[in-house]
From Swiss-Prot:
Species of provenance: Clostridium novyi (strain NT)
Top-level taxonomy: Bacteria, Bacillati, Bacillota, Clostridia, Eubacteriales
Gene: dtd
GO molecular function, one term: Ser(Gly)-tRNA(Ala) hydrolase activity
Protein name: D-aminoacyl-tRNA deacylase
Family: Belongs to the DTD family.
This protein's domain notes: A Gly-cisPro motif from one monomer fits into the active site of the other monomer to allow specific chiral rejection of L-amino acids.
EC numbers for this chain: 3.1.1.96
InterPro entries membership: Daa-tRNA_deacyls_DTD (IPR003732), DTD-like_sf (IPR023509)
Keywords from the UniProt entry: Cytoplasm, Hydrolase, RNA-binding, tRNA-binding
Cellular component GO terms, alphabetical: cytoplasm
Amino acid sequence: MRAIVQRVKESSVSVDGKTIGEIKKGFTVLVGISKDDTIEDVKYLKKKVVNLRVFEDENGKLNKSLKDVDGELLIISQFTLYGDCRKGNRPSFIEALGGEDAKKLYLDFIDMCKEEINNVQTGEFGADMLVSIKNDGPVTLMIDSKKEF
């Protein structure tokens, strides 16, 4: 399971011109799910996301987590995180998990995040979405449950 975590001042997602999720201070998390992912990968990713210490403390150090600052989450599914661009110019997505299996793990991730974060907003799984992000920092991190990077 992979995620791009972006610290944001605000972020929103729209489908067909209608805003379906928006947050203020927190993280926008783009989530990709692979064919090899299980509930253990979901647990790993959730633990990392909610506990990442990338918000400033009173001394200006990146020392506070999303939970510490009562931050918000906007979670967006993005199978293209498993795009393999090493060969040719057209990405291959054969490592991405598709359909209902991917949707279930995505929803499990959302549910687990909701257990610890007060405001969790989401995109629409499988939809064509317009995501607006106002990066803060910018602070952008890549997380892989298989620790490939």
